[in-house]
């Protein structure tokens, strides 16, 4: 009972103390809309614990302090530069070395990366001179890139090939233009192409002049009759810049039988079976060449025509024996009409000299070598002789007819 009374007294005393304390006012502040926006905007991001290094050497600097790391051998240039200086040089701090290494490593890729990009673009593209601005040919170059550049020729198609564009219409106005343009090249290119656009109707004289100029200056002439054809030439030369010459080179077999077959089948009427027969009979090409016509005729399947072809091919001289003077062709001689007398019953006599000459011409006897002057003089002399003989015979006939008429009148 005593304990319960004590607890009741304590609780009463606590209630009395709480009641005696002054009551404090609690105020809750509500922020405005602007204060909320400002607080959200000025909210700072939490600091990140990741600190990236400035260079590759700084990022992997801990490798040098490990036991596994071994320094690389010094280069020849570094060794030569370090020998005269000796030990007087003061080593820089590790931070400075790292910074210099980082600067050099970061700067070199930029410099080396920018140059190859330009060079590769120029290598894969046709370099066009600024002189060709406005040329409609450039619109037709579609399969290959082209770039304007400060170059001497009109087009640079590779390291050793270039092209000069020429219009025949422009050549007629300026005949010396091509000569001066070729002279500017100064043989700096192995392949110099003159791309000639034929845009005139009368092409004989201008093409002759362009061909002569190109040949005298070791240039290759390519003629095109349209702008698209000119563009195809430029594209093809650029595409085949680094191609080997296997496409145009003849491929020769290495074995003896195929070479023998290739050489003997070039003779007319000789086939592959004949080559096998000749090879098995004589053994080699030298024995086939030295064989006589009788030996060749003994081979089965080779007739007289093939024997003659083979023998003539192996024994005829390579160079034909031609005369030093050009062969002279005699012009046809006009025949004078022979007047027939209706009253006379005598047959018309033919000129004996004319008949003999015609027979000789039919036989085609070989005449001695003549020059043009001697041949013409001989022809005119014969012609004058024949005319004089015919005139004399005509006069004799006229006199005989006149005398016959007088006798009939008497």
Curated annotation (Swiss-Prot):
Any GO MF annotation of the entry: damaged DNA binding
GO cellular component: nucleus
Pfam families the UniProt entry points to: HHH_5, Rad10
CDD domains named in the record: ERCC1_C-like (cd22325)
Any GO BP: non-photoreactive DNA repair
Group of enzyme by EC: hydrolase
Location within or outside the cell: Nucleus
Acidic residues bias spans: 344-355
Keywords, comma-separated and alphabetical: DNA damage, DNA excision, DNA recombination, DNA repair, DNA-binding, Endonuclease, Hydrolase, Nuclease, Nucleus
Disordered: region residues: 1-28, 66-121, 322-410
Biased composition (Low complexity): 76-91
Basic and acidic residues biased stretches: 356-372, 383-410
EC number: 3.1.-.-
InterPro entries linked: ERCC1-like_central_dom (IPR047260), ERCC1/RAD10/SWI10 (IPR004579), Restrct_endonuc-II-like (IPR011335), RuvA_2-like (IPR010994)
Residue ranges, compositional bias (Polar residues): 92-121
UniProt function note: Seems to be involved in nucleotide excision repair (NER) of damaged DNA (dark repair mechanism). The UVH1/RAD1-ERCC1/RAD10 complex may act as an endonuclease making DNA incision 5' to the lesion site. In vitro, is implicated in double strand breaks (DSBs) repair and is required for homologous recombination in the presence of non-homologous overhangs. In vitro, is involved in chromosomal recombination between tandem repeats in both direct and inverted orientations. May mediate the induction of a DNA-damage sensitive cell-cycle checkpoint during the G2 phase.
Protein family membership: Belongs to the ERCC1/RAD10/SWI10 family.
Record note on quaternary structure: Heterodimer with UVH1/RAD1.
Protein name: DNA excision repair protein ERCC-1
Gene behind this protein: ERCC1
